[in-house]
Amino acid sequence: PGKRVLIIGGGYIGLEIAAVARKKELQVTLVESQERLLKRVACSQTASYFKNLHEQNDVKIIQGQSIVKLIEKKGAFAGAVLDSGEELHADFSVIGIGVKPCVYLAKGCGLELDNGIRIDKFCKTSDANILAAGDCASFPYKNQRLRLESVGNAIEQAEVAALNALGHSKEYNAKPWFWSDQYDTKLQIAGLSSGYDKVV
């Protein structure tokens, strides 16, 4: 209790860590470089709701600013400096700023890449003898290519890839679904946060 944590990143991971840290009575400052929380994964109304929830739980939220420098004291982390020049002092930091797929093995095999390992609707790569699934795989979804970083996608896609490795011809039909637990609130999202007509 009482320790100061600096959380860098206002996506699901950053917000979930903030909620747990507050339950443990830590002082929490969260920095998000985008103009709002959950920018890549949720609509502005959802982001606003969760911003208010965290502020009601005494999380200091800074949006639209980036970390430009880390502060060291006696060889240990002591905080960070924002692009505004403001110094944020903390005892430790947690960084959750997105997912970049690790594709060096696929690249070394000469596989086609497209924001991850490019797969078709059967989870096959550009080499039909190699299949891929999970957070590293970019797959066709409607009129675009998509890479989902979620447990549900990883499990369902792996099941399809395994069946196809055994000789089946099963198509992967993504049904994007996400959840997040923060304080006593459970968020569940079905679908994607772009291309919608209205928020209900």
Description of each model-found segment:
Residues 1, 76, 81, 86-163:
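FAD-site-proximal beta/loop scaffold in flavoenzymes
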